[in-house]
Amino acid sequence: MPSEKTFTIGDVSQQTGVASVTLRAWERRYGLIKPQRTAKGHRVYNQGNIQDIQHILSWLNRGVAISKVATLLASGKSSAAAAPVAEQWLVEQNKLLAGITELKQTSLNQQLDRLNKSVPFITLCEYVYHPLQATLAQRWQQQPLGYQLEQQLWQQSWQRQTLIMALRTEKQKLQGHCYLASLDLKGPSLGYYLLHSLLLQSGLRVTAFSKVEDLAGLTRLHNNAEWPLIVYAEQRIEQTAFKPLANLSTMWKDGILCCGLASDIHHEQLTSLGIDFVDGHSNDAWQSAVMKTWLEQTKR
């Protein structure tokens, strides 16, 4: 009788899109998954575990708090028949908003640590981080007293999160390398940090440049041009930048990929130059066919 097929935690992470750190949290903290262990203590998952993970994801995508998922799984209820619980995501947004507006960096970091460990990152992007950023943008347009401090606090918290994820990725099996360069001269946006985080959680080693003022300078990377390059921009790109962009695309082995809301603005110019692009927010771009193809090519 053939033995049951098993998977490593890295295999499961790649198959389900759930980061290894999140899978461990679901096991240790919430008791949601019960993988077997090898003689050396390594986790091994079977197909039943993967089905459990899919069920957990379906509940989370309905807005159910991770702490309540175990009870729902035990009840045998189907998430398909459940109404979305948008209030839970609003609660998480408000907790983060309080940490920002009250300038409580420790509290803010703790909230982000908890969320990023216990909930799949792509789900957080769609239901927590992007909606919160829209709220913050409206607030900062009114320029309340000390709003620049809030902006710096929010940015520093994401610098910390990407560093944590980068260090974690260094310990995992290498999936591939890429470059990420932001053209936003006002500094890296939340969308940049979210895309950086998604790349790291996919297992890629990312060499990131958070503020590139001179695109021609990226030609210095040509010795490693086999590593794919993503150019990110939220704001309108200066017309003088398109010639250097075209030169970079020609220099790179498989061309370059442009991401960010600027791709919505300049899609006609990018198309005419033959430059691949993905528009929309980070979570939408990440789930696009173009990005999935790019990931497959990067990891081959």
Annotate each language-model stretch with its function.
Residues M1-S3, I33-Q36, K173-G176, A225:
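A short alpha-helix capping/helix-coil boundary motif
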Residues P2-T22:
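Polyanion-binding surface elements
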Residues F7-I9, A39-G41, A81, Y179-S182, ...:
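A short, structure-level motif marking secondary-structure boundaries and short turns
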Residues D11, A25, S197:
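Surface-exposed charge patches
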Residues V12-S13, R43-N46, D184-L185, A208:
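A generic secondary-structure micro-motif detector
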Residues Q15, S20-R24, G31-R168:
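Long amphipathic alpha-helical segments
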Residues Q159-R300:
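C-terminal regulatory/effector modules of DNA-binding transcriptional regulators
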